[in-house]
Amino acid sequence: MGISSIIIILFIIVLLKKLIKKEDRIHRINKNIPGPKSKLLVGNLFDLKGQVHEKLKEWYEQYGSVYRIEFGSVSTVVLTEYATLKEAFVDNGEIFQSRFQRKSRTTCNKGLNLANSNGEYFNHLKKTLSNEITNQKMKKNEKIIKIQVGLLSEFFNEISGGGGGGSGGSGISKEPINNIIKMYSLNVMLSLLFNIHFPYNNNSYQDELMSTITRYFKSTGLPYPSDFIPILYPFLKNKPKEYFEDYESVKKLITRITNEYQLKHMTEISNKSTIEEIENYQPTNILESLLKQYRLNKIPYDGVIGCLMDLILAGSDTTGNTCLFSLVALVNNSNIQEKLFNEISNAFNDDDGDELNGANDISNSLLKLSYFSDRIKTPYLVAFIKEVKRYYPCAPLSVPHLLTEDCEIQGYKIAKGTQVIQNIYSTHLSQSFCSNPLEFSPERFLDSTNEPKIITFGIGQRKCPGENIFEIEIYIFLVYLIKKFKFSHPIDDNLQLNDRGQFGLSLQCPQLNIKVESR
């Protein structure tokens, strides 16, 4: 045996001893938390294939609101129910704030993006983005969203018989509309960031781009063995191959667009020579604000690209899937769809000159619509959106956290170093959250004094700063399209569309074909 082999073996032994010593403390503290039995080395990883959120719901119903599972060698605690999540992530927010760092993710983003970064760097990123996504600034940007809804409505108009695309005017979409709907939310983010957008058609490049984003979001939510079984990392560090290829593909596109934007729109800041001059530069959008911080050496360029990828990927996939599930809910609950149509028709009646009457009216009728001032006119629609977010939670498990100090939650002591998961999916579908949780009922949100508290992307100090963009996009999307179109099952009005979401970082809507009729 050569000296190099001996050194490697000794290194592995020392590493394993350190790992066992560290894990012994965490396991010793966490062992009193109930949970399923785990297997040697792999823990419960083999149980977490496919519909992970449904398995965690099954365990919640068996073990309660605080339970323990093993991701390989990583002790993990799953928290469910609003009171439990609030106790952890709000009442003890500081020690639950950090993200659990997974090598597969940091290999791609270097831990420099908003979703995965920690500490002061994360706080600086969040402040930079939050300052650019205030309600006041979003009021000025509502027009961008309304223009995209108007363009999307042209696609639906073609399906319904008003044009030559989509379905040839038959009323039924020839292909699933998932990528087109996600293109709407992608275009909103591209317009907000770069002042560009893609057309709404089944172009092969656009289809591949949206399919890549969907694939990435489905895979990035899954637990990879290489992240949790250290001894396997050297052999599996580039697996699954598709995940890394999808990330690099989207990163290349966003980097190119960002570089082009700088050359075209930011010659002023690019030529600044002093810190004071850069400090005095007034950004006009989120991208310029991030690039300003880069010029001030407060964010590396990889951090700029990482944050843009968070906004674009998460913005298109979470919002897009929520819009898709909204359409599914309209089709599967035709009585609710009619209630919404009547409410919207009365709120935006023709006598006021506010008739939402087609893409050609973007300059007048649609541009008068405002999320900020018009929500009060549509309480049932607001309740419907909340119920969609409850019934089809867009981030079923959010992004895992890391506990940085020992803490007691609901009577159970949890060890420092534990991975912690927010079980949003099970929370929204639990009896503790609302009565009859498996029934789709917007009425539960009409009583504002006693309504359940929705968790959209997560709870606590890592709450997504872009949540208001998400809310505006969905509201305007639904007001305009419900007023213009009737949506139904493509084969038989008495049939139900499949609404079982597929697990991913965001809950994926099944492939959706739909019948569209003009109102």
From Swiss-Prot:
Keyword tags: Heme, Iron, Membrane, Metal-binding, Monooxygenase, Oxidoreductase, Transmembrane, Transmembrane helix
Pfam families: p450
Its membrane topology: Single-pass membrane protein
EC number of the protein: 1.14.-.-
Principal localisation: membrane
Gene Ontology cellular component list: membrane
GO molecular function: heme binding; iron ion binding; monooxygenase activity; oxidoreductase activity, acting on paired donors, with incorporation or reduction of molecular oxygen
Cellular location(s): Membrane
Similarity annotation: Belongs to the cytochrome P450 family.
Name of the protein in its database record: Probable cytochrome P450 513D1
